[in-house]
């Protein structure tokens, strides 16, 4: 049952889980010193689904509504706060948003769009690189993995984390290329090669940095993880329909719908301070898959409204027109509303299914596949309702 009146113990519990953002390192250590020390996985909440707060300053409320402003606020939650996920409920969200879902936790309600559903599935790590391989792909299967940095700091995302005194982490659903294993610190660690030695992962914005993370937080991907779904179906019969009004994506084999999910496509809005329109709308029309890559650094410079970004390890990318891709998104849970810079955001689980089902097939060894017209992969019908 939801505890609507918090005891002192409950209050200290929820207050304490928000301390990880600004107090992530011992006070005696500088940010650079903290980056260099090995890090174990923390003890995660004991819950089948664990909600991770994706944004700073999110309210924990006593009721599933923001009506009344802050009248029902219990606590201000920091980014990466972890909460036991009891159930989703239909709430009352004021402010023009279509998503009305809140997540009920033992301590209160959190707006669902800013709470990533994660799981804690630790793995038995391997201690040697697979024979004959230069490395391996690995998927994060815990809420997050704290990272140890090796070498020079170069990437905008890491510099941003340090400027805000926030720990660099990999999050549930991200996929990375590992090229080394060590046990010298008393536990197994994998080294994430952010550039991936030219394997394709580092295209477009990677900075060639190296990070270590505890191996138990990563599932080593196998051929089964990328095996084709419905391999006996004629590839021409596989198509996708993207509904820009309803923010949904459907996969078809002939006329039969075989998969459906909510997505977040490109956003179109007006800047409050200038009245300038910013249009990242995903285009309608017939779009053709021309590039698939297991994981990619996605980076854009400063644009209108100061909306540049640098996001490493974006998983399961299916490019369907220029730089527009269907891919996994771990930084929000606002699926069903426009949100992106033009790409089609899906949950990591949905993006992985689409990646495996769509054409062309991508093996672990290759890591990516490209097509040039007249050749192309799966066709996507992007349209309004």
Language model region names:
Residues 75-78, 247, 349-356:
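Solvent-exposed, polar/charged alpha-helical surfaces in well-ordered, non-transmembrane soluble domains
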Residues 25-68, 82:
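C-terminal segment of N-terminal export signals and the immediately downstream linker at the start
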Residues 76-117, 168-216:
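SH3/SH3-like beta-barrel superfamily modules
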Residues 1-10, 17-20, 25, 32-34:
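N-terminal secretory signal peptides
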Residues 233-235, 270-271, 280-284, 291, ...:
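Exported/periplasmic cell-wall-interacting domains
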Residues 33-44, 103-142, 194-234:
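Boundary regions of SH3-family modules and the immediately adjacent low-complexity/disordered segments
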Residues 65-79, 159-170:
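SH3/SH3-like (including bacterial SH3b) beta-barrel domains
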């Amino acid at each position: 049952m939801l505890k609507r009146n918090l005891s002192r113990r409950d209050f200290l519990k929820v207050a304490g889980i928000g301390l990880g953002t600004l107090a992530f390192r011992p006070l005696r250590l500088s940010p650079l010193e903290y980056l260099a020390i090995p890090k174990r996985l923390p003890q995660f909440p004991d819950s089948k689904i664990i909600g991770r707060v994706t944004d700073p300053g999110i309210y924990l409320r006593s009721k599933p509504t923001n009506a009344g402003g802050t009248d029902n606020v219990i606590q201000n939650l920091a980014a990466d706060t972890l909460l036991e996920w009891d159930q989703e409920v239909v709430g009352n969200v004021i402010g023009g948003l279509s998503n009305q879902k809140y997540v009920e936790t033992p301590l209160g309600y959190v707006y669902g769009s800013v709470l990533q559903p994660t799981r804690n599935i630790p793995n038995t790590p391997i201690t040697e690189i697979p024979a004959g391989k230069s490395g391996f792909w690995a998927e994060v299967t815990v809420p997050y993995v704290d990272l140890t940095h090796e070498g020079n700091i170069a990437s905008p995302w890491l510099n941003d984390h340090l400027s805000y005194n926030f720990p660099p982490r990999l999050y549930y659903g991200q996929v990375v290329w590992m090229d080394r294993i060590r046990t010298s610190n008393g536990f197994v660690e994998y080294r994430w090669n952010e550039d991936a030695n030219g394997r394709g992962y580092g295209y477009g914005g990677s900075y060639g940095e190296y990070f270590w993370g505890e191996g138990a937080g990563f599932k080593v991907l196998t051929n089964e993880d990328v095996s084709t779904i419905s391999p006996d179906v004629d590839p021409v019969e596989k198509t996708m329909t993207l509904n820009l009004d309803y923010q949904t994506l459907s996969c078809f084999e002939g006329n039969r719908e075989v998969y459906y999910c909510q997505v977040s496509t490109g956003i179109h809005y007006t800047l409050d301070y200038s009245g300038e329109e910013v249009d990242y709308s995903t285009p309608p029309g017939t779009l053709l898959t021309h590039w698939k890559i297991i994981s990619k650094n996605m980076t854009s410079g400063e644009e209108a409204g100061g909306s540049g970004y640098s996001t490493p390890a974006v998983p399961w990318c299916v490019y369907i027109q220029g730089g527009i891709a269907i891919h996994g998104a771990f930084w929000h849970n606002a699926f069903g509303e426009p949100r992106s810079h033009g790409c089609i955001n899906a949950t990591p689980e949905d993006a992985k299914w689409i990646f495996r089902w769509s054409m062309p097939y991508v093996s672990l060894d290759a890591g990516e596949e490209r097509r040039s017209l007249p050749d192309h992969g799966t066709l996507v019908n992007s349209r309004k309702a």
